[in-house]
Every structure is written in C-alpha cells, then in structure tokens.
Amino acid sequence: MIFDHYAAEVALLLSDVRIGDLLEVAAGSGAVTRVLAASMPEHVSITATDLNQAMIDRAIKVGTARSVQWQQADVMDLSFSDASFDVVVCQFGAMFFEPKSDAFAEVFRVLRPGGQFLFSVWNSIDVNDFAREVIRSLAEYFPGNPPTFFERVPHGYHNRQIIGNDLAEGGFTSIPVLEEKSFTSRAPTALHLATAFCMGTPLRSEIEQRYQGDLGDVVNFVSASVERRFGSSNLEGKMSATFVNLKK
C-alpha cells in the first residue's frame, strides 16, 4: 500500500553501485531488501538487519531473488567492524532511532571512507493523505485525548535542519542531498486501509490504551471516515517522503 514505490526509488538511487558491500538497517519485513536483491549486481553483497527477529524470520520466509545475509542487529550498537560497508540503506526507520545522532554515528563507523548513506523519512502528515484522514478520524473518536504516535514518530522527523544537525553530530561532514518524492498510495478498500493503520502499526497500542472494547468498533469508525473521503474501494491518496543521500 505504501512501501513499493519507495523501495523502487531506493534501487534507482543506488543503480550506479556495481560492486561492494551493502548493509540495510531496520529492514523490517524486507520490502527494500527484496527489490535490492532483484536489482543489484551479484558483485554487491547484501546484509539486511532488523532489531526484531520476528521481522527477519518473516522476511526470510517470503524470500529474495538471490542470497541475502540476514542478521538481528540494533542500529544503536551494530556488531560489525569499522569500515565494513560501502553503502548503508535505511527506509523509514530513522524516525524511530533515539537518539538519532547515536544511530548515525554507528552508520558512520561501519561505512568505509567515501561510502554512501541513503535513508528515507516520511514528510509531514499534512501531505500524506491516508495517514492524515486516519488521525483526523481518531481525534474525532477520542476527543480530548487523540492518539499522537503518527504525528510524533513516523511523520515527526522531516525538518531538514534537524536532520542535518543529527548527521553532523553523528560524524558526517559532507552536505546531505535531500530530495522530496511524492507518489500515489492505493488501497483496495476503506476497511483494508483502516485495519492496516489501526491494527498493523504501533498506533494499535495507543488505541488500546484509550478503548477497552472491541477494536473492531474503532476500525469501523475509521473505515467509515476514510470511505467518506476517498470512497469505499480502489482508494487513492498522496504520500510524500524525503530521501537523504550523503557520503562519508
């Protein structure tokens, strides 16, 4: 629903990498990993990591077009030697790192001189249609105590000056290239979208803290709001993110 376009964009931005060692951090269930495994030359070794072993197990089960080294790893304390990789990639994970400068310092450490760091972050919730409508409807459902996770975390790290400062604190001295990319996100039904956001993301825990009844009640309310805004099926909405690209 939201990751495929950006995974393809990662592969495009790395299309000039023909040989070397690539590390992906916060790989999740492997959306980017699968695209890279299918598009990168065999001479580029791929190591994909995530903090959550369950996510790695899921990614392994789905499989990749060629061999990938999967490993559980914490980006705050990577188990790799200094100067081990030519490229480090992270799609939609940097927003969760805390403190971010420490994570960037680890990336800097494992990169070889001249190595490339490419990561993406979501832009403001105001320019991400589906997320904005979900949050708006939840604020209506929980007046006075709306869930704030999406605005604080996934859509809370897009200030270019702050990103640049965090990278500098992590040791990077080159000027990052920041490029905004917008695509159309699609969902088969309003219910599918509401379920994905409310049940399949950390937003669920915020809902559970506020409602002890059947979570289906909340999902149905959000679904109805989404349907009024986007229709009941074949939904389309704008999504917007920024790619940050720099060298060590």
Give the predicted meaning of each segment.
Residues 116-143:
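Conserved class I S-adenosyl-L-methionine
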Residues 86-100, 123:
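A short SAM/SAH-binding and catalytic strip from SAM-dependent methyltransferases
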Residues 2-20:
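Conserved alpha-helix/loop element of class I SAM-dependent methyltransferases that forms part
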Residues 101-116:
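A short glycine-rich, Lys/Arg-flanked "PGG" loop and its adjoining helix->strand segment in the class I
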Residues 21-78, 102:
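Class I SAM-dependent methyltransferase SAM/SAH-binding core
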Residues 11, 34-37, 104-108, 135:
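A structural alpha-helix within SAM-dependent methyltransferase catalytic domains
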Residues 29-31, 154-248:
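Conserved Class I S-adenosyl-L-methionine
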Residues 76-87:
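A short acidic, Gly/Pro-enriched loop at the edge of an enzyme's catalytic core
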